[in-house]
Design a protein with these regions (language model features):
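A short beta-strand-turn-helix
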Residues: 65-67, 72-93
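N-proximal helix/coil linker or "cap" segments that precede and/or mark the start of modular domains
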Residues: 36-72
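N-terminal Lys/Arg-rich, disordered targeting/topogenic segments
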Residues: 1-18
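Short, internal strand/loop/helix patches
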Residues: 126, 137-174, 182
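Thiol-/selenol-based redox modules, centered on thioredoxin-like
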Residues: 170-201
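Hydrophobic membrane-insertion alpha-helices, especially the h-region
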Residues: 21-37
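Conserved hydrophobic packing residues within short motifs/helices of P-loop NTPase cores
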Residues: 95, 126-128
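Conserved redox-active cysteine motifs that mediate thiol-disulfide chemistry
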Residues: 89, 97-114
Length: 201
């Protein structure tokens, strides 16, 4: 039996191209990595990043208006200062719900950082989490991120209610939700730049 399996494996391996062999090895390494708890989150984030795509905008008839009550929803920054969405309503708002333990959140973070580097305070970046500031600060420093992080101060408005993270909303200065995306995405894309540039005209 052992010699038979060895022979079958040899024939299988000889028929494979070098590309197929490398693909098989990468797949095996990924499976092994997922079985190791310490590396599972990083590998899951890597895979999520590979499959992420630039999100599209909602059709105009599906772009919900943010209510005045929701504009009063408050969040606190790293220093404890409290803000409401209405403080940012004169510019595009990039509202992202995330967590440090979430692989798809981690996967899209570098792209959000690049988008933030490109636009800075011309766009209101609100990365909202319910984790402790200490844990978030340690994560941000380890990864080298400096996007603005905010913390829940009250329940999330119905317009932004979600069962999954990451979920991202892009809100126009006219208070319309033009993008609602659940899952990792490529945010620093040409399409996204065009959308934000149009909003700021």
């Amino acid at each position: 039996m052992k010699s038979y399996l060895k022979m079958r494996w040899k024939k299988y391996w000889e028929r494979k191209t070098w590309f197929s062999k490398i693909s098989d090895l990468v797949f095996i390494l990924l499976i092994i990595g997922l079985l190791i708890p310490a590396s599972r989150k990083e590998i899951s984030a890597f895979v999520s990043g590979l499959t992420a795509m630039s999100p599209g905008t909602l059709d105009e008839d599906k772009q919900l208006s943010v209510s005045n009550a929701s504009l009063n929803w408050s969040v606190a920054n790293q220093d404890g200062a409290v803000f409401s969405l209405s403080d940012f309503q004169d510019k595009p708002i990039f509202l992202n719900f995330w967590a440090t333990w979430c692989p798809p959140c981690i996967a899209e973070m570098p792209d959000i950082q690049d988008l933030y580097d490109n636009y800075g305070d011309r766009v209101a970046f609100l990365l909202v989490t319910d984790e402790s500031p200490e844990k978030v600060n340690a994560f941000m420093q380890k990864k080298g991120f400096n996007m603005p992080v905010y913390y829940h101060q009250s329940g999330v408005p119905q317009e932004f209610a979600t069962q999954s993270i990451p979920t991202t909303f892009v809100i126009s200065p006219e208070q319309k939700i033009v993008i609602r995306k659940t899952g990792a995405a490529k945010w620093n894309s040409k399409k996204m730049h065009q959308l934000l540039d149009e909003m700021m005209q």
